[in-house]
Amino acid sequence: MRDDLGITTKLENGKAYLEFALPEKIGRLLSALQIEIWEGAEGERLVFHGEYSSEETDSMTALLLRPHLWDGMRDPYVYLVKAQGRFGTVEYGENMGGIKNQEESDHAEDITEAVEVYWQQELAIYDVHVIDKKGIFLNEKEFLPHEVVYRLPPQISGAGTREEQIKGDLDRLARMGVNAIRLEGTGSGTEGQNRCEVRAFYSLCRRRGFLTDDLWIRPEILPVYRGLPGETMAEALLAADGRTLTERYYYYQAKWSSEPVLYPALPTLHRQENGLLSLSIYSNQKKVVLYVDGVLFLFQSAASGDPEFIFEDIPVAKLPLHLAAEAGNLSISLTVTKL
């Protein structure tokens, strides 16, 4: 079963105009190509059926009225596309995704056999574009990208199958507030990646509401999900062991997530030159309160767009030191035994 039927979409006046394209080196179409579009990822109801002859393969189009739009995290809706046709090939390989059917053919002298080829893939219909000096818009609504660079996990590890790892990664990124993902690389981020793996990854992203387009100018440095052994990267969100989330993960979670966040960044706890302590706390709440040994020490109000609250000159008479932080309905307590 193949998943590489080319599909481009254009939205106009509440209608979706679709154009289909066969992959390269597929062979010559010997029969009508049948294409169906079904509602929902599991194919609940047929909404389009088309048949295209070999003379029409350069202009295979479809029209959907009032399509259900894929709308990111709000509504990651996808259609199911099915297609099949018989193609003449010189040789048969597993990459044809079909069933070998030996038969004599008079379509062309160079066709030695015919293969029935099947496609099944998802279709997300949406519109994303950039308006100069205004921003990015998804389905005519402003879209603020919370984007990370993603590195595919190793094929073999102690953290389960690759698909299981990716699903777990996407769940963590969703909790962090990410809404756009780019595979590591330049441009579309897919250089050097296996095309089947890339399509499978993008399918998982679509189902979870992550945008994977490449239409806007990005900042020079994006946070990277999954560090590498021996690599020193300040923006890595996941350590090289594949299990440990870094401080930067919680920083961006406090910056991007819509869920309440309160996280004391213990690696930032250090003694100042004057002998007192300094500690950073990440939160998306309006105010953070710090207690030292049960006594109110200081509260800080949030600076615009900055999730980091830096508490300085924290007194330490002796160890262990008991700290507690509150923000909104959240609270957390710490016991410091050494510095």
Predicted regions and their residues:
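Proline/serine/threonine-rich low-complexity linkers at boundaries of modular beta-sandwich domains
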Residues: 1, 252-261
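Short hydrophobic/aromatic-rich motifs at helix boundaries and adjacent loops
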Residues: 141-142, 220-225, 260
